[in-house]
Amino acid sequence: MQTVNAAAGRPRTLAENQVWLRQRLEARIHPLDFCDPAGTRAVIDGLTGLDGASWGEAWSAAGARAEAAGDWLNAHAYYFIGRFPTPNHPAKLAAAVKERETYLRVAEEKQWDLQRIVVPFDGRADEGREIAFYYRRPPGIARPPVVALWGGIDAWKEQLTAQVQAFLDAGIATIALDNPGTGESPVVASPDAERQFVPVFDWARAQPDLDGERIGCFGRSFGGYWATKLAHVMPDRIAGAVSWAGGAHHMYQRDWIEASRYPDSYLMDLAEARGRMLGAQNDAEYIERFAALSLLDQGILELPCAPLLLVNGKVDRQCPVEDIHLLLEHGSPKSVRFFPGGHMGHGPHTVPTMVAWLKQQLVGRG
């Protein structure tokens, strides 16, 4: 299969991105893992531009057709691509709203035991006042342990279904929420945005039918950053944390910011999506706010740390594997698993390895 690589220092053209999308569709991997192949090929072939209007409207039209046919899963998948990677245009923002609505219709159709929970958040003047998450329980277990999981820049709580199911199959309840600065998160990503997790952890602890005194944490892609930070700043509340391809320090330095603007593993607008997550209004603000996330510079890496598993592909071009080596040189010992390939090290054993490790921390800790 032909591999598309963006030329150094520039984004892909429309034609190059169409090839990239077809490759992802054929492989059935993110962000096209749930799309109907025939219908998706037609949308890809008919794309006229990568700007927010052209992109959002093309995929939303496909979503509307799927909705009209009662095909909620494909409608959800099309609306997700319509806002991908971030809703930085009105057409993409409209797609993001429909993405959430159709996800709940999918849950209803498939008879998932899914509850959308909203809890208060004591936000600042420019922040939201509540945080929403999806709560699911494994059947037949009276008081299961629980893991909170979140995605990264473009994979939000609605894209965590496969990982949620893996935890449910392992007898673990799940709380799926949005990474700070994405989806329905009430905050932007900032050096103290871990505040958004506290009311969620409090909610889990207060449920009499959950073993929520010390929970598991699972951060996917950029979300692994928060799993790492929470393991260091709230170790008494966390039984174990998994950082699946998250950064720590090197990722936020100027040289990596420039080197990772146009990685071959990412479709488009990675810097724009990161900037929106940070609440940045321009590239200079993006660079400044990204640098402020360094856990090394924040001085927390020598703090006692909850059990922490660091996972990534060996040749990640979005998050430097040097951050894993850095974390091993500071503070408490950590567990590490590298997999072949690039960002996140996708493969048949990746998610099962992480789920088994986290289950051991939750169930075997006594």
Where are these regions (language model features)?
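N-terminal cap/lid segment of alpha/beta-hydrolase-fold proteins
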Residues: 52, 59, 94-140
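Catalytic histidine neighborhood in serine/cysteine hydrolases
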Residues: 329-345
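Conserved alpha/beta-hydrolase "acid-adjacent" motif
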Residues: 317-323, 346
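Short beta-strand element of the alpha/beta-hydrolase
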Residues: 143-152
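Short beta-strand/loop motif that positions the catalytic acidic residue
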Residues: 303-305, 310-312
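Alpha/beta-hydrolase active-site loop
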Residues: 159, 166, 187-210
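Conserved alpha/beta-hydrolase
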Residues: 167-184
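Hydrolase active-site cap/lid region
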Residues: 232-289, 306, 338
